[in-house]
Amino acid sequence: MAASVMLSSVTLKPAGFTVEKMSARGLPSLTRASPSSFRIVASGVKKIKTDKPFGVNGSMDLRDGVDASGRKGKGYGVYKFVDKYGANVDGYSPIYNEDEWSASGDVYKGGVTGLAIWAVTLAGILAGGALLVYNTSALAQ
């Protein structure tokens, strides 16, 4: 009973909302001095050198002059940056390079040595897997 009398005499007052800037030692500050202190500057256009640019240059063969989405072609295709960057778009990461692929596809360009390396690698992976299975089984006990 005395506790209920004591609680009824206590009144709660709303406290004002204040924001204090707290800084902890050893932690970096997340505030910046001024928003214009950070600036990104490009170093300029760097042209790559290729003997011959990869990819198609100049035009695209579109059926009825319309691409798959129904838009009319503009005549320069995807690969239009040979003058600006020194190579076509595909020159940076060519999908097909004649120096790496066989002309007919009948012969592996790596030769017998490449096939031997491939076979040894595959055999090593399979033998390693078999060894792991054996070591974790009851047969190894």
Swiss-Prot record:
GO aspect biological process, one term: photosynthesis
Modification sites for Phosphoserine: 59
Broad class of the protein's primary localization: plastid
Keywords of this entry: Chloroplast, Membrane, Phosphoprotein, Photosynthesis, Photosystem II, Plastid, Thylakoid, Transit peptide
Any one GO cellular component localisation term in the record: chloroplast thylakoid membrane
InterPro entries in the cross-refs: PSII_PsbR (IPR006814)
Pfam families: PsbR
Compartments (UniProt record): Plastid, Chloroplast thylakoid membrane
Organelle targeting peptide span: 1-42
Lineage: superkingdom: Eukaryota
Similarity comment: Belongs to the psbR family.
Function in brief: Associated with the oxygen-evolving complex of photosystem II.
Protein name in UniProt: Photosystem II 10 kDa polypeptide, chloroplastic
Taxonomic classification: Eukaryota, Viridiplantae, Streptophyta, Embryophyta, Tracheophyta
